[in-house]
């Protein structure tokens, strides 16, 4: 398990110097090719214990009531002040993230708990689709996952525009939300697949 925990400025300074321009992001994305549509792999598990803190885990527990155990999801409020069950876990495609972030050491900065090699597009995984993720089962939820100013600060304005543009939204380049239906362990390298 690795943790980024110094001050916010120190923490992200080593990761910030390079923002890929749009042409490079698009070129790398084409070169990376398409992710599988049915049987994918969990590439990275990232816990966010506190704001701007990341822990890369070899194994985690996805819990129906608490999301990723140890993550701060429950403190990231919905409109009513409580946790938003439709935004319990965020999932991002590893090939898309590699196109944007480059070095794997920077992937955790995206802030998504699960980085996976699976086609996350709306056409492939409409809301309501169930996924087996390691020993857990989760359901794709409706709310879009869009990039924010932190994402732009870490990866650049071109990355944010590419992720949030019309094609980006259809492909869910910025990722998607799921909620846990059946608690269970998830490990790096575990399968992620559609449940019939």
Predicted region positions:
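Metal-cofactor-dependent catalytic cores
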Residues: 1-196
